[in-house]
């Protein structure tokens, strides 16, 4: 049957960390998380006012250490990014200085290819134009004897 102390009326939702009803676990202010990466939690509700100074000092030290770590990590990231940028710049400089002759040769080759393409286009246009003119001449030749015959009669 039902347990005598577990009615819905008797059970009140409360904090699982400190046990006080009035707030939920995620709202608990009686516990402080020292390091967000680790599961180190300090119980503030059980400490007395005399010890609070010592704990606040410890908390300050821990927070200072954590800030130092974060700053060091950021500095390392910045240094790595700077080194990468320097390496990229060095690579670009070395490539450009050693391949100046190659780049000029490549430019000449590109220019020559463009010229060849232009010549081919011009030739094909000329050829088409000549064909049209030949057709016109043939038509004129065919039609001109007919005209001459008509004029003769």
From Swiss-Prot:
One of the protein's GO biological processes: RNA splicing
Positions with biased composition (Basic and acidic residues): 66-84
Keyword Phosphoprotein: yes
Location of the region described as Disordered in the Swiss-Prot/TrEMBL record: 44-153
Sequence ranges of Basic residues compositional bias: 85-94, 106-141
GO molecular function: nucleic acid binding; zinc ion binding
Keyword Flavoprotein belongs to the record: no
Residue numbers bearing the Phosphoserine modification: 52, 96-97
Highest taxon above the source species: Eukaryota
Disulfides per UniProt: none
Key words of the record: Metal-binding, mRNA processing, mRNA splicing, Phosphoprotein, Zinc, Zinc-finger
InterPro entries: Znf_CCHC
Zinc finger (CCHC-type) stretch: 13-30
Summary of subunit composition and partner proteins: Interacts with SREK1/SFRS12.
Job description of the protein: Possible splicing regulator involved in the control of cellular survival.
Identification of the protein by name: Protein SREK1IP1
Gene name of the encoded protein: Srek1ip1
């Amino acid at each position: 049957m039902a347990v005598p102390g577990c009615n819905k009326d008797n059970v009140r939702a409360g904090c699982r960390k400190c046990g006080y009803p009035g707030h939920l676990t995620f709202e608990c202010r009686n516990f402080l998380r020292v390091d967000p990466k680790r599961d180190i939690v300090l119980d503030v509700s059980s400490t007395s006012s005399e010890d609070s100074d010592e704990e606040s000092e410890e908390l300050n030290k821990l927070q200072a250490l954590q800030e130092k770590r974060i700053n060091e990590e950021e500095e390392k990231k910045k240094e790595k990014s700077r080194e990468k940028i320097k390496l990229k710049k060095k690579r670009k400089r070395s490539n450009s200085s050693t391949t100046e002759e190659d780049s000029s040769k490549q430019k000449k080759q590109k220019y020559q290819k463009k010229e060849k393409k232009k010549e081919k286009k011009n030739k094909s246009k000329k050829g088409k134009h000549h064909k049209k003119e030949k057709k016109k001449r043939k038509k004129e030749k065919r039609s001109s004897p007919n005209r001459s015959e008509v004029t003769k009669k």
